[in-house]
Amino acid sequence: IMFVWASAAEVEERGSDQRDSPASLKSMETIFQSEQRECRYLMGGCSKDGDCCEHLVCRTKWPYHCVWDWTFGK
């Protein structure tokens, strides 16, 4: 998230003429895509624990979604 914020601040410093250019918009799109993870967030749908992000597990009863596994840490 800090990377996205810093990149947005850098684009802001360049001025609106460059910020609104198609190349700049494509660059920002790439930044946001890089932040997307291949796991499901809290309350995201799942079918197994591996679908969920770290410290989340797939709920074993319907409705199946990712819930906190009561662990802490990195």
Swiss-Prot record:
Keywords: Disulfide bond, Ion channel impairing toxin, Knottin, Secreted, Signal, Toxin. GO terms for cellular component: extracellular region. InterPro entries: Huwentoxin-1 (IPR011696). Its main location: secreted. GO terms for molecular function: ion channel inhibitor activity; toxin activity. It is found in: Secreted. Expressed by the venom gland. The keyword Glycoprotein does not apply. It holds the Pfam family Toxin_12. Residues 8-36 form a propeptide. Residues 1-7 form the signal peptide. Disulfide bonds join 39-53, 46-58, 52-66. Belongs to the neurotoxin 10 (Hwtx-1) family. 38 (Jztx-33) subfamily. Probable ion channel inhibitor. The presence of a 'disulfide through disulfide knot' structurally defines this protein as a knottin. This is U19-theraphotoxin-Cg1a. It comes from Chilobrachys guangxiensis (Chinese earth tiger tarantula).
